[in-house]
């Protein structure tokens, strides 16, 4: 099986996609830890669809009286 090279999502360097690379898809432990830190500090977020039309939701929380 041929070893694939992929771009490290953190720094953009080539990284091996193989069992020999324990940090895949990252090129190094450092890049893996930087990425984990970004998730932990909320630098990365997964977009959530706007559910304002869903029953039971208050579209404007300041309108409560």
UniProtKB/Swiss-Prot annotation:
Keywords: Metal-binding, Zinc. SUPFAM superfamilies: Glucocorticoid receptor-like (DNA-binding domain). One of its GO terms (biological process) is regulation of DNA-templated transcription. The keyword NAD does not apply. Binds 1 zinc ion. Residues 43-65 are annotated as: Disordered. Pfam families: YacG (PF03884). PANTHER family: DNA GYRASE INHIBITOR YACG. This is DNA gyrase inhibitor YacG. It comes from Dechloromonas aromatica (strain RCB). The lineage of its organism: Bacteria, Pseudomonadati, Pseudomonadota, Betaproteobacteria, Rhodocyclales.
């Amino acid at each position: 099986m041929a070893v694939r090279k992929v771009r490290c999502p953190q720094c953009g360097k080539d990284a091996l996609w193989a069992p020999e690379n324990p940090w895949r898809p990252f090129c190094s432990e450092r890049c893996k830890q930087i990425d984990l830190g970004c998730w932990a500090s909320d630098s990365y977020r997964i977009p959530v669809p706007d559910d304002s039309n869903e029953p039971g939701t208050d579209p404007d929380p300041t309108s409560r009286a």
